Amino acid sequence: MTRYPDYLSKLIFFLRKLPGIGFKTAEKLAFELISWDSEQLKILGNAFHNVASERSHCPLCFTLKESKEADCHFCREERDNQSLCIVASPKDVFFLERSKVFKGRYHVLGSLLSPITGKHIENERLSILKSRIETLCPKEIILAIDATLEGDATALFLKQELQHFSVNISRLALGLPIGLSFDYVDSGTLARAFSGRHSY
């Protein structure tokens, strides 16, 4: 077993925690990073420090926001209140924004429901979601959730929780591959899934 200096071993260890990064890729990235000059590494280190100290979630929709701001720019700006899109994580919000297929409001669940792993949706996020529906009075709630077993369980749970609201609940159309996360879906496929969404 190759014995690396402690600082390099720790760097490889933490890089491997990133999704999709195995040992060889982590090793390659680590050697790339140690080839950077000290100033570049300090800038990168500051970026990591800022994530730890400044990361903050919007109290309304729970996507990411600037720590100095009261809420996120999605909630501050003029958007279509007739549509509310429910997603699992903040990254889904930014992905949908890049695809330019949605102009309404967002709500981030934080996780998908999974009885097997014990994942659940926080009561606070669910409570605020219901409160926002009462306030915004949207005509449609779009479940933009991965086409996985966890996504299906979450969609069914939300349908049951929100069924007393007089609002149409829809889910993205088939075309999103079963078992695939939004991360791997191109904008064109997502646009078709949005335009072909169906009542759920």
Swiss-Prot record:
PROSITE patterns: RECR, TOPRIM. Residues 82-177 form the Toprim domain. A zinc finger (C4-type) spans 58-75. GO terms for molecular function: DNA binding; zinc ion binding. Pfam families: RecR_C, RecR_HhH, Toprim_4. SMART domains: TOPRIM (SM00493). Keywords: DNA damage, DNA recombination, DNA repair, Metal-binding, Zinc, Zinc-finger. InterPro entries: DNA_Rcmb_RecR, Rcmb_RecR, Rcmb_RecR_Znf, TOPRIM_dom, TOPRIM_RecR. GO terms for biological process: DNA recombination; DNA repair. May play a role in DNA repair. It seems to be involved in an RecBC-independent recombinational process of DNA repair. It may act with RecF and RecO. Belongs to the RecR family. This is Recombination protein RecR. It comes from Chlamydia pneumoniae (Chlamydophila pneumoniae). The gene is recR.
